[in-house]
Amino acid sequence: MKKFILLQCFFLATIVTTVAQDIPFTPLFQQTVKGDMIIVGNAILNKGDSRPANAPYNGDHDNSRINMEYTDVDNDLSTFNSSSADVKEPVSTCNKRVIKAYLYWAAAYTQERVDNQRNPRLERSKFGQVKFKIGNGAYHNLVGHKVYDGNHIVSSTGWDQNKGQRAYVYRADVTNLLTNIGATYTVADMQAPFGTEDSGAGYAAGWNLVIVYEDLARESRNITLFDGFSVVRSGRYPDISISGFKTVPSGPVKARIGFAALEGEIGIYGDKLRINGTEISAPGRNQNNFFNSSITNETGANLDRNPKSTNLLGFDAGIFNLPNNGNNLLHNNATTATISPYTVQDSYYPFFFAFNVEVIAPHIVMEKRVYDVANNDVTNATNIAFGASLRYKIRFRNTGNDDAKNLVITEVLPNSLQNKVTSINVPSGVTFTSYNTNTREIKFTVDKSLVKRNSTWQEISFGVQVANNCNDWRDPCANQIANSVSATYNGVENPTSDGFTTKSFPQAGSCDSGTAAPTLFTVNTDFTNCAYKETVTLCQANAVLTAADGFDSYKWEKTAGGNIGQKGTNRVLTVSEAGTYKVTKTKAGCATMYEIY
């Protein structure tokens, strides 16, 4: 895509109705994590003509007036285009987990392609749909959130509006699809134009994946993800302000920037990136041609892709370390920064930025285990007796680089435990605040002296008792007693006003880390002889009996009084005759339970 042409005044009235409206860049995600972020991606279009579209293109042509064809690398006849990118598993001595992952896909197209493209058609109604797979797994059909699809002309080299360049951007939250970090990620069936665009506006299409992950061996980083859409051209560019962090108080300030954009050209210079007002360069990205149709990482071109073209013909994505020698761009104790894409010649369309800066922040970790009266660890045990006395032990410490304050630890007892706590033991500096019998919530407050940076483990413990009243055992899987401890806290130096939250894990692993999950034990009880019982008075012609929700199946039968036998298979049973009614409730993986009315 080339520079905007100047318009004659008498044409302005007819053109202004199609001028693109920018979407302001706003934070999508902001969190302080001990970890980092990864950005990869690929184009879905490649130079065709006499060469295979799956062959890497390393030439210097721009994306106009050439034949653009779909790449299709997945060896799957059911998809019409595809490309992939590899992510290497980060090396660490600690456990890692994905905190957040987003997939973006974007294209520059023309109305002429929407009207005339065939096999397959370019369908606006399907812009928000792609296929996404991890490794050798099956494709997931994604429906994205629209970031930009105004159907406006964003650039033109002539007066034919059907050939004016338009653009779309969509994203999807794919966090729950990623079980690991390292994998080959493939995107397919992305709506994109193909063929030869002869007006000079050009076609472009590609995708990028951003992964934010926790790794307790790494420093605390405040990571902010932004998306929006801007037509950047000479004299017209956005300033993206970032706040909600505080850099380290001394020593080097380390930051990383991520981005994705359409229409940066390898051969058209002048598109640049400023950080806090200073033009920057990065490995693989010249200061005077920062957006240059490439995928890069901290060391330069990222070719762990298929196809592995060095020229992606109008699609850019990457991540780089901020060149901050002597903290000249980002100072100690800084709390704001500004990212500014701009140009003196080419026009291009950034739609994603990420800001990742090492900060000072506390990090509370909590381990929760279960013990019997003989002080045996019975976490995950499957033979706990009805009415057994047990003890929860909660350990906590601060592994961050900032002191913590205002730490409040909260436990909510499940209904399968008696509504009381006993024998509460806390270290000096921890206060048992309250136990609310209505909400079954127990709270502890912790003095900041116990949670200074890199503090030692502290332990809270209290007694609980497994319920011994059959009417306390009504819900699905009630005999699988699982719950977590949660905590809220603030940093002493970290300025985040919303503070921090965390949940417990069942066992501290490497680096005092773990995956947040409930602590579990199972009560071994035959519920045939322990049914929930309730008396319902038949005052009118009918009475409604309602069993507990959440089971897979229900089987009602009348066991005494009048017409006995099976009565229904729904959760709710309407009866018109006095007697005894029993419902058998089943759920896969859980004990069979009963109710009697």
Segments from the language model and where they lie:
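Bacterial Sec-dependent N-terminal signal peptides
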Residues: 1-22, 530, 539
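Proline- and Ser/Thr-rich low-complexity, intrinsically disordered segments
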Residues: 20, 522-597
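Low-complexity, intrinsically disordered segments enriched in Ser/Thr together with acidic residues
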Residues: 170, 316-326, 445-490
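A surface/secretory-pathway sequence property marking extracellular, secreted
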Residues: 369-373, 405-455, 501
